[in-house]
Structure formats: structure tokens, C-alpha cells
Amino acid sequence: MQCALYDAGRCRSCQWITQSVNEQLSAKTADLHRLLTGLPVEQWCASIGGPEQHFRNKAKMVVSGSVEKPLFGMLHRDGTPVDLCGCPLYPASFAPVFSALKPFIARAGLTPYNVARKRGELKYLLLTESQFDGGMMLRFVLRSETKLTQLRAALPWLRAQLPQLRVITANIQPVHMAIMEGETEIYLTDQQALAERFNDVPLWIRPQSFFQTNPTVASRLYATARDWVGQLPVRHMWDLFCGVGGFGLHCATPQMQLTGIEIAPEAIACAKQSAAELGLTRLHFQALDSTQFATAQGETPDLVLVNPPRRGIGKPLCDYLAQMAPRFIIYSSCNAQTMAQDIRHLPNYRIQSVQLFDMFPHTAHYEVLTLLCRL
């Protein structure tokens, strides 16, 4: 992928950009084989790639500069700003949004936050696009609620320029730290969730719910999990760390009993909305800690699907799964190193299938899906 920002030495986020996508995929596949050394794998499925550019559905922009000339991008460690509006990972549809937002910031009087001086209001812009209908969600991350009245007053102009903005919020992040968002979310539109659809499954994106940033590859990941579960005798399933329910909603059938657990209430609200649209009455989603939920249950499902953050599921949950001994475990991971550690804590399971998904091109990161069967 050609990138003017990389060529100019202004951005090094895509550290593997000089390698072809095939070379990247080969290196990632070799890394996964290395991490699973000593763990017999019955079936290595072909690695799945995707587009090398314009694939991201989300932009996270630090706002710097002045209110008259704001700059969207990132800050180097020395505080030097870099404009990332031309990043080739973003779809072409983002450019007109960035262009309209620059004069809007002046209209609304949203002074960019100055890290060195600890002054200003606008810290970040978070933009998400739906691949389903092109609708967008825009979040203004502010230091305080001081400029909310001005922001609301200026919004009609912005919405006239950008009718694709379906959900607009102000997130309040008062702490002087590199934290992307705060706990308080103030909706500035009637619509509060962005509609998305993968493989004919309705999904919803809310401001504080995690959603994969590479829709093309994510849809194939969910479809693969659905196909694997469809070949197994599963009538009762848990979906732990379920997020907005992508895995569970793909895998569920009208006859299946499924419980999805996720700590974030916003994500659970999305999952419940999707289940209602699909008419799946035996799906139950709850906002709980996944480990605490699992270890408090007395019944054993046929299959447990886990999709933890980078730290993995950890030894306590591994030990409980080993004791509970469901017939099948599907492990989706964005960190194969912690996944391999967790699998080694499940000695009574064999690896039936493994498949790598290149969710993060031009970096060393990837997603992996693993099917474990009880011995």
C-alpha cells in the first residue's frame, strides 16, 4: 500500500507497510504456528485476508491546532501534531466529513485541547461508518460541558452539510490523560444507535460499545463461527465477552438456547435489539462480568464461545471451563499469544480447527478463531 504519510516519515503506525499483503499474511501465519507449537492441530484452515486499504470503518482523531485552523490526526511524543485526514486506511467517504468539520469547529467555538497548557475543550473526534447504509456516528470528546450549548446551536448547519450523520454525541472526558473517552455520553440526536448488517444479521453500534474496525474481514470471521457451530450438536451455548452479540447472533438458531454476557451495558442493549429483530426468543443477553457469570453457573452448556480482550480469558476462567467441561469451546482472539497460554490451561481439550483472519493489515496483529473439542 502506498502512503504519503509513511513515505514522508510523519506516521509509522503501519509498521509492515513495506511488505506485500501476501508477505504479511505468511509472516502472521508462521507466528501463529510458532505460538501453537506443542499443541497438535487437526485442521489448519487457510488464512483469510481482506482489502489492503480503505477498510477501516472508524477514525479516532486527536484534535489540535487552533479553533480557526483545527488539525485532525495524532500527536507525536514530543507534542508535534500530524494531520491524518489523508490516511489510506480510511474510506473515501470520510474525507468530506473531515472537510466539513473544520469550519464547523470554528462555528461552534470548540477550541482544540492543548495538552501542554491543559487548556481548551475539544480533545478527540470519533467517526464510525456503517457498511450497511452509509450512515455515520460522530462523537465529540470534550473536556467539559462548557461548550454544549454552542455545539447544539451549531449542529443544524453540520447536519445540513452531512445528512449521513445519523448519531451525534458529546462525550465528556475531564481527565488530563491520554484516555480516549469518558463515562458520560450526551446524545445530540434522536437516533442513538447506528444500523449495521453482516451476513444478513442485523447489528447495532452504540457510542460506548466495541465493534470490529474491519467489516469485510469481521463478517467472514462471524460467518466462519456460524459454519463451525452449525456442524456441531449444539442446543445450549454461552457467548462470553459477547460485545454487541456478533458471534451469538450468527450462531443462534430458533431451537438453540443462548446466553450472551458482556460487561458493557451499551453493547448488551445493541445485542438485545438485534435478537428482537431476528425473532430469536431463546437468546438472553446480560451486562455482567463474563468470568463471574460463568463461575456462578451450575449448568453446563454444549458449547462456550469466548472472545476476550487482548489479555485473554485468564487462568481462573480456564480452570473453571476445564472443570465444567463443555463439549466444545470456540476461542476468538486478537492476541494469539494469550490464547495459546489459555489453551495450555485446558489440557482435556484438543484443537480441532484453527483459522487466521487478517483483521489488521500492515501491522503484526491478527485475529484467530480456534475450535476446541473435549477429549
Swiss-Prot record:
Q: Look up the EC number in the record and give it.
A: 2.1.1.189
Question: Where is S-adenosyl-L-methionine annotated to bind?
Answer: Q212, F241, E262, N307
Q: Which family does it belong to?
A: Belongs to the class I-like SAM-binding methyltransferase superfamily. RNA M5U methyltransferase family. RlmC subfamily.
Is-annotated flag, keyword Iron-sulfur? Answer: yes
Top-level lineage group: Bacteria
Q: Which GO terms describe its molecular function?
A: 4 iron, 4 sulfur cluster binding; iron ion binding; rRNA (uridine-C5-)-methyltransferase activity
What reaction does this catalyse? Answer: uridine(747) in 23S rRNA + S-adenosyl-L-methionine = 5-methyluridine(747) in 23S rRNA + S-adenosyl-L-homocysteine + H(+)
> Catalytic positions?
C334 (nucleophile)
One of this protein's Pfam families, by short name? tRNA_U5-meth_tr
Q: What does this protein do?
A: Catalyzes the formation of 5-methyl-uridine at position 747 (m5U747) in 23S rRNA.
Keyword Zinc recorded: no
Question: What is this protein called in UniProt?
Answer: 23S rRNA (uracil(747)-C(5))-methyltransferase RlmC
- The organism's taxonomic lineage, starting at the top: Bacteria, Pseudomonadati, Pseudomonadota, Gammaproteobacteria, Enterobacterales
The EC class name is transferase
Q: Per its UniProt record, what HAMAP family does this chain match?
A: 23SrRNA_methyltr_RlmC
Q: Which PANTHER family match?
A: RNA M5U METHYLTRANSFERASE (PTHR11061), TRNA (URACIL(54)-C(5))-METHYLTRANSFERASE (PTHR11061:SF30)
Q: Which residues bind [4Fe-4S] cluster?
A: C3, C11, C14, C87
Enumerate the Gene Ontology biological process terms.
Answer: rRNA base methylation
Q: Show the disulfide pairing.
A: none
> InterPro entries, per this entry?
23SrRNA_MeTrfase_RlmC, MeTrfase_TrmA_AS, MeTrfase_TrmA_CS, SAM-dependent_MTases_sf, U5_MeTrfase_fam
Entry keywords, A to Z: 4Fe-4S, Iron, Iron-sulfur, Metal-binding, Methyltransferase, rRNA processing, S-adenosyl-L-methionine, Transferase
